[in-house]
Amino acid sequence: LEGHVAALHGGVCINLSMMNEILEINPGDLDVRVQAGVTRKQLNAELARHGLFFPVDPGADATLGGMAATGASGTNAVRYGTMRENILGLTVVMPNGEIVQTGGRARKSSSGYDLTRLFCGSEGTLGVITEVQLKVYGLPEAHSAGVCAFKTLEGAVDSVISIIQMGVPVARVEFLDEVQVRAVNAYSKLSYAELPTLFFEFHGTEASVIEQSESVAEIIAEYGGGEFLWSTKQEEQNQLWQARHDAYYAGMALRPGCSGWPTDVCVPITRLTECIQLTRIDVEETGVIAPIVGHVGDGNFHLLLLVDTDSPDEMATAKGINDRLVKRAIEMGGTSTGEHGIGSGKLPYMALEHGGSLELMRQVKLAFDPKNIMNPGKVIDIG
């Protein structure tokens, strides 16, 4: 998404897809050790036999080594966290060929520098991740899902802030704006009100998911939410969430033949409404079609800028929207990227976001990879 794998200067691309063995499953300790080429779906298929699952879900069936290298996230990060919170340890091949192990199987440690988190999200610039030790979780006894439309964006976001503050353990909470809802209605033959809409998912016991759903229904009613449709039946849950699952393809269908440029800023959740509103004004003034989806529980949202890549004017307009959005998010105390990473695409914003600490990152890169052979030109520019 940000040019992570593009060989800007040529080079050797390492394919780890054949390193796809699940090496250890430890049900009692709720951890596993896998090779880098194991995919998320492959792991969860095996874990299900033990009544377990790995929750981080970026959408695609990504490899776990790739998810570690990019610091991947997903729709259920609001409850289970991102890859950073779920990695216990790594095996990494360093630029000089040395093999190192970081972390371990203990759930906490105050020993030494946290090299595991340093490699997580490094995008291959510090070493090659070959094995990953992960936390896993017990499969929930029950699920429920719900959908609710709001008169205003502010009401939708404020309801989520209240839900989180009240301690309701929501597993997923996703936001679609009016443009995106209109798109999924047309694409998936649905009939949702074309208003800011929240999609919820709850995990737990049969009793607890009902309690969570009822608690959320009470809270959203206080913030101008419409009817809260929810169900504990799997088929009905799938129907309720179809709009969110189809969002990308529905968005692309708004302008057939064009390309989609996804943005990825993340801001403090109390600034989310303001950031989205200012961004929508910017988009409307340019005339670009750009549906919005968001992981509203952690302040991360995505525009899908629909542009003709053969048009220099349209590309310049899209670039301007993205540039202003990133700077707006950073000014609000947020980040240029909540989950897509830096690659080469977000390099121009690193100094603005990190200030003096950018030089420390540069020194880390040079200490680990003095010859700059590991994915050069990504994450940090060392000149």
Feature map (PLM): residue ranges:
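Conserved, mostly hydrophobic/aromatic
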Residues: 124, 303, 369
